[in-house]
Amino acid sequence: MNHLVIISVFLSSVLLLYRGESGITSSFIRSEWPAVDIPLDHHVFKVPKGYNAPQQVHITQGDYDGKAVIISWVTPDEPGSSQVHYGAVQGKYEFVAQGTYHNYTFYKYKSGFIHHCLVSDLEHDTKYYYKIESGESSREFWFVTPPHVHPDASYKFGIIGDMGQTFNSLSTLEHYMESGAQAVLFLGDLSYADRYQYNDVGVRWDSWGRFVERSTAYQPWLWSAGNHEVDYMPYMGEVTPFRNYLQRYTTPYLASKSSSPLWYAVRRASAHIIVLSSYSPFVKYTPQWHWLSEELTRVDREKTPWLIVLMHVPIYNSNEAHFMEGESMRAAFEEWFVQHKVDVIFAGHVHAYERSYRISNVRYNVSSGDRYPVPDKSAPVYITVGDGGNQEGLAGRFTEPQPDYSAFREASYGHSTLDIKNRTHAIYHWNRNDDGKKVATDEFVLHNQYWGKNIRRRKLKKHYIRSVVGGWIAT
């Protein structure tokens, strides 16, 4: 009986993705913390003990297929060592990787020494322990590599955007760390340090690095840049876009033949993840346009059935904040997204949560005389997760009436998870930060655009279908 109920819920979820059912505008109002940054003397920004001890440790994927990581950290007083000692047994570091370091200035702020170290030739699905040393100070962490790239490799991603460093941000981070997710897809707008001036800009980049280290040192965060990473401040003499961000946060862009760290792609487990830059040129014949055109042809849905795109500015958004800002990128890329049957597109920027049905504006519904998005079974689901908790507060004013394409929307802080079960199904949750409790507010079953088609489902043997669906039900 329980299995029948679960199957019924699953089928209802699938139908809702395709039918233009009336969406939900949540009336929930929570008592959030004030939208102000946490004071610098708070324990969440605590500097590690020991002279010149490594801090702001974070890792990201270091290659195309998940057999490498890039480990980054800062030593505040002097360079120290750029080596990472690592191994598969705690306390036994049989391997050593050599990194590099640099520092930079921003106005009169001078950064610490920023280290980046590529650790490669790792085994899949293995827990590694690593140690970073600086003189007599050392710190130890661990991470787990993803499974082999395989169509049925299960994997759970967290999705966070527009985070900042307020008490609401802390609530989001703490809730996320209880989710069991294995890596973060970050949708841009990290520290919000650009809301400060002069030397405080760099100081708040440092504090944010220490703030998120409790997660970023132990699992990869896949970065994308937002408008608050641009840091264009000509009144301070700083006119190089993304200067702070690019000095501190590196990406494996060369592995996907990108010419810029701001747009790139990786394969992880059963997912092919494409990261785009909303604040770099993307119109026809630009480097980003050419790269995306080529990268989409490299996607092999037989190996990585889940095609996920990250960007900062949402293409579809019914909030009054940043309304229609994503229209230029929609015009440039939406036809490709539909053609290649992208499963889901995540964005941030709008400080609220919203999920769409599968819709597109590739072919206008001209029968009504309006150019308006229409249901499209080949289109992605668009999800805005710009509710990480930053000091600008929530965007609480949605357009009325709710558009037909909008399935669910709410102005609350939170994070999402995408739990990929196999090549055909994934379970999605949006978790609201509800007064210190983890609450799953919006959830549905996402079926894969490639393997969900009948012609390809027939390629799967009947016993395989029973095993993967039965396994999903059992969980």
From Swiss-Prot:
Induction: Not induced at the transcription level by phosphate starvation, but accumulation of the protein in starved shoots.
Disulfide bonds: none
Cellular localization per UniProt: Vacuole
Record-listed Zn(2+) binding positions: D189, N227, H312, H349
Active site: H322
Cofactor note: Binds 1 Fe cation per subunit.
pH influence on activity: Optimum pH is 5.6 for the phosphatase activity and 8.8 for the peroxidase activity.
Modifications the protein undergoes after translation, according to the UniProt entry: Glycosylated.
GO molecular function: acid phosphatase activity; lactoperoxidase activity; metal ion binding
The protein's required cofactors: Fe cation; Zn(2+)
Annotated substrate binding sites: N227, H349, V350, H351
Chemical reaction(s) catalysed: a phosphate monoester + H2O = an alcohol + phosphate; 2 a phenolic donor + H2O2 = 2 a phenolic radical donor + 2 H2O
Entry GO terms, CC: plant-type vacuole; plastid; secretory vesicle; vacuole
Mechanisms controlling activity: Activated by Mg(2+), Co(2+), Mn(2+) and Ba(2+). Inhibited by Fe(2+), Cu(2+), Zn(2+), NaF, molybdate, arsenate, vanadate and inorganic phosphate. No effect of tartrate, Asp, Gln, glutathione, Asn, ascorbic acid and phosphite.
Residues glycosylated per entry: N103, N365, N422
Tissue and organ expression note: Expressed in roots, stems, leaves, flowers and siliques.
CDD domains recorded: MPP_PAPs
Enzyme Commission number(s) of this protein: 3.1.3.2, 1.11.1.7
Keyword list, A-Z: Glycoprotein, Hydrogen peroxide, Hydrolase, Iron, Metal-binding, Oxidoreductase, Peroxidase, Signal, Vacuole, Zinc
Binding site for Fe cation: D162, D189, Y192, H351
Main location: other
Protein purpose: Metallo-phosphoesterase involved in phosphate metabolism. Acid phosphatase activity with phosphoenolpyruvate, inorganic pyrophosphate, phenyl-phosphate and p-nitrophenyl-phosphate as the most effective substrates. No activity with phytic acid, phosphocholine or bis-p-nitrophenyl-phosphate. Has a peroxidase activity at alkaline pH.
Name of this chain's protein: Bifunctional purple acid phosphatase 26
This protein's encoding gene: PAP26
